[in-house]
């Protein structure tokens, strides 16, 4: 769970875990920013049930969290169960544009990291990864 590491400087020992007690989240970046008057929002293309995020996100300061299927484009990815990142970028952008005052938006990407499924690529906006230039580096090409 990257958000634990990046926002709270914590490490999960397993992906099958219970996170309580929740006092360890008091030093998470979103909690500290809320105390400074920031409006906090979080976005993730998967279900809130994935890793039970619906239970512990509020404790780390991510009370206003948006999960699948509550987006304007809920077309499923091929690589992961949920909305592809390119399908929710408009929701994230709209939240940023409509922010009043200080705002912090945390977007946990779903499918723009390894492994990449060619079925989730945008076609015209990607390179021809079969060119000799990318020989043996097709995954890197699709980044």
Where are these regions (language model features)?
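Solvent-exposed soluble domains appended to multi-pass membrane proteins
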Residues: 1-143
């Amino acid at each position: 769970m990257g958000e634990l590491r990046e926002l709270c400087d914590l490490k999960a020992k397993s992906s099958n875990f219970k996170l309580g007690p929740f006092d360890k989240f008091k030093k998470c970046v979103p909690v500290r920013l809320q105390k400074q008057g920031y409006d906090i929002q979080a976005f993730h293309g998967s279900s809130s049930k994935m890793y039970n995020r619906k239970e512990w996100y509020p404790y780390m300061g991510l009370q206003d969290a948006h999960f699948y299927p509550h987006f304007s484009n809920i077309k499923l990815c091929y690589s992961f169960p949920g909305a592809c990142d390119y399908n929710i970028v408009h929701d994230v952008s709209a939240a940023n544009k409509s922010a009043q005052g200080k705002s912090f938006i945390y977007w946990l990407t779903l499918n723009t990291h390894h492994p990449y499924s060619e079925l989730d690529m945008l076609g015209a906006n990607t390179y021809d990864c079969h060119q000799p230039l990318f020989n043996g580096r097709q995954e890197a090409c699709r980044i």
